[in-house]
Amino acid sequence: MAAGGFKEFVAGETLDQDEINDYLMQGMLVFANSAARTSAIASPVEGQFSFLKDSDGVEFYDGSGWVEYSGAPPLFDFLVVAGGGAGGSRLNRSGSGGGAGGYRNSITGELTGGSATAEPSLFLPSGSFTVTVGAGGTGGAPSTRGSESRFAQILSYGGGKGSGLDAGAVYSAGDGGSGAGEGGDAGGIGRALLLQGSNGGTDIFDAASGGGGGAGVVGGNSTGVVSSSGTGGAGGAGLSSSITGSAVTRGGGGGGGARNTGGAGGTGGGGAGAGGAGTGSAATVNTGGGGGGSGYNTSGAGGNGGSGIVVIKYPDSITLTIGGGLTSSTATAGGFKTTTFTAGTDTVSF
C-alpha cells in the first residue's frame, strides 16, 4: 500500500504502530479501486484521502462515507458585450453616433473595454448563474441606450444613446458602456462608464455631429470649416477577441450624421452616420455596435444599436443546463467548451 507522504529518518530512529498509522493518515493512499480500499482500510477516519486508479479520482472520508474531491471551482473565461446605443435624430441639426455596448473580456493577451488589459478569469462553484444578452437601443427622437448584458456577476452597461432634438426638446448624448457622440448644441459628449469602453467624439458645429465611442477607441470628432462642407465623426473602433477560436471584432461606435457627409461606422459593427437628409444605419447584430446618427434637417431616425453577445469558455468536463429563454450554441476543442449566447435571458446551471 503506497502513500503519497514521506518522512526523512535519522540514524537510530524508530516508529511505533501508532506513529506509522499517523503518517499513513497524512499521506495520499493509492488503490486500484474502491474494493481494494475497503479491504485495506476497515475503519477510515474523517479527513483521510485516497486516490482510485480505475476512476483517476481523489476522494476523502467525511465521517460517514467517501466523497469525491473536486478541488478548486472551475475557471471560466468570458466575453460580455452589452447592446449598443442607437444613433440620434435631430430636426434642423444632425444626430450623433450611438456608443458601443460595454465590453468585458478575460482572455489573456487580449484587451478589455477602453483598451485595458484583460480582466481575471472567473471561478464559479457548481450551482447556477444568470446570463442576459442585451438588446440594442432603438433609433428615434429620442433614441434609446442599449441594454445590459450579464454573465454571473460580470455586468456590461448598454451603450449611450445619440443626441436628439424633438419638438424643441433637446436630448443630450448618453453615457454608457461607451459614450455617444456630441450633436449640435445638445450638451457635450457621452462618456464611458467604469472603463468598459470609450467616450464619444465632439462636434464643431450643429450640422456635423461626433461619432460614438467604440470599445477600444474614442469616437471621432466632426470636421469641416463651414456647415455645408462638414463631415460627421467616425465611430470609435471596437476590439478583437478569439475566444471562439476565430478573431472577431465587436463594439464599434456609430458614425455621426452631417449635412454633407456622414461619419463611418466604427470597426466592429458600428452603423454609419447619414449625410444630407438620410437615416442613420443600424449597427450589426451581436456586436454591441452603436447606431449611426441621422442626417441634417430630417425626420429620419438614427440607426438602431446592435444587440450584445455573451461567450464563455470552460473545461470540457463540465456540462451546462441552459434555460429555454436563451439562444445559444456550444463548440468543443482542445479540452474546452465554448458556449455563445446570442439572445435572451435565463438561468444556467452545472
Indicate where each model-derived feature is located.
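Bacterial Sec-dependent N-terminal signal peptides
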Residues: A3, V58, A82-A86
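Surface-exposed loop/turn positions
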Residues: E13, V45-Q48, G127-S128, G308
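Short beta-strand segments and strand-loop junctions that repeat across beta-rich extracellular domains
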Residues: D56-S64
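A generic structural motif
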Residues: S55-D56, T345
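Tryptophan-rich substrate-binding surfaces of secreted polymer-degrading and adhesive proteins
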Residues: G63-G71
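Extracellular/surface-exposed low-complexity repeats and stalk/linker segments enriched in Gly/Pro
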Residues: L15-F49, K53-S55, S70
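Low-complexity, glycine/proline-biased repetitive segments and flexible coils/loops
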Residues: L75-F350
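Short, intrinsically disordered N-terminal pre-domain segments
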Residues: M1-D22
